[in-house]
């Protein structure tokens, strides 16, 4: 048994990515970068001047049981970075072990991080746990989203077996600003339940945390959603220092398009610059 566990461990990926951003010559730059396969980072680009756009890559194509990914991001004072991915991540059916991803972000004074990965496809019978921990310094802002598709819908696959857990925490100077724990076991009754997926394969969350949002902008965010006839549902909630949007429905693209509109709204009103979708996005 121990020999089998050792073989499984050797066959698993333990990917790491560590990034530190600094403000230099009126521009945010990558000061330090360390990566361990299968995680990697493309060369940063600057489509909007001082903001550093960085693209993360998973060169193995997806995660299997036993894989572990660890991402650490540090933003020094006054920096502004946007991180995204080249494609949606994939979590394949479990081999008896779980896959996990841990992201830790430290934002110093007045730093801004936009965490905008393209999403995750969780295959039937997958076991996946993801954790996001963010620590905000004074005046710092975290903007991020998470989009998950349960099952390969185009093949008629649904998430009938498996286990998915997501844990997000955002703190500022010892005070919790947002804590969100989600658990979705793969079961037919959970798939159909209105308290689960309600028969819909896609769920998503958009977060803006660290700076207050006026009530009129909350209503504007709701109005940006275009009602559909496919059973999709949305919601927007104002936080003491931010805003959260939720989506449940059939379309990752529809959710992403709405999130981009909300992102553009908050960027324009709070940062004085419109949204600038990264060039790698399939828009």
From Swiss-Prot:
<dbReference type="InterPro" id="IPR002669">
    <property type="entry name" value="UreD"/>
</dbReference>
<comment type="subunit">
    <text>UreD, UreF and UreG form a complex that acts as a GTP-hydrolysis-dependent molecular chaperone, activating the urease apoprotein by helping to assemble the nickel containing metallocenter of UreC. The UreE protein probably delivers the nickel.</text>
</comment>
<keyword id="KW-0143">Chaperone</keyword>
<dbReference type="GO" id="GO:0005737">
    <property type="term" value="C:cytoplasm"/>
</dbReference>
<keyword id="KW-0996">Nickel insertion</keyword>
<dbReference type="Pfam" id="PF01774">
    <property type="entry name" value="UreD"/>
</dbReference>
<comment type="function">
    <text>Required for maturation of urease via the functional incorporation of the urease nickel metallocenter.</text>
</comment>
<keyword id="KW-0963">Cytoplasm</keyword>
<dbReference type="GO" id="GO:0016151">
    <property type="term" value="F:nickel cation binding"/>
</dbReference>
<protein>
    <recommendedName>
        <fullName>Urease accessory protein UreD</fullName>
    </recommendedName>
</protein>
<comment type="similarity">
    <text>Belongs to the UreD family.</text>
</comment>
């Amino acid at each position: 048994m121990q020999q089998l566990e050792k073989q499984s461990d050797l066959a698993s990926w333990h990917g790491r990515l560590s990034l530190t951003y600094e403000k230099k010559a009126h521009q945010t730059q990558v000061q330090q970068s360390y990566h361990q396969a299968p995680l990697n980072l493309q060369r940063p680009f600057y489509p909007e001047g001082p903001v550093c756009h960085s693209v993360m890559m998973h060169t193995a194509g997806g995660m299997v049981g036993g894989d572990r990914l660890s991402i650490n991001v540090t933003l020094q004072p006054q920096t502004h970075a946007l991180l995204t991915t080249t494609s949606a991540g994939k979590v394949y059916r479990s081999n008896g072990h779980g896959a996990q991803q841990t992201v830790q972000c430290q934002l110093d004074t007045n730093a801004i991080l936009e965490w905008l990965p393209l999403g995750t496809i969780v295959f039937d019978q997958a076991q996946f746990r993801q954790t996001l921990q963010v620590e905000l310094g004074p005046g710092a802002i975290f903007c991020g989203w998470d989009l998950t598709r349960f099952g390969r819908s185009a093949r008629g696959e649904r998430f009938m077996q498996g286990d998915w857990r997501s844990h997000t925490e955002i703190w500022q100077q010892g005070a919790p600003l947002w804590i969100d724990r989600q658990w979705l076991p793969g079961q037919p009754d959970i798939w159909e339940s209105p308290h689960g997926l309600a028969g819909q394969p896609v769920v998503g969350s958009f977060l803006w945390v660290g700076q207050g949002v006026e009530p009129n902008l909350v209503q504007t965010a709701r109005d940006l959603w275009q009602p559909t006839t496919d059973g999709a549902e949305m919601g927007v909630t104002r936080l003491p220092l931010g805003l959260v949007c939720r989506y449940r429905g059939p379309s990752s693209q529809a959710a992403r398009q709405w999130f981009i509109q909300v992102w553009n709204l908050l960027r324009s009103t709070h940062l004085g610059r419109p949204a600038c979708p990264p060039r790698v996005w399939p828009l």
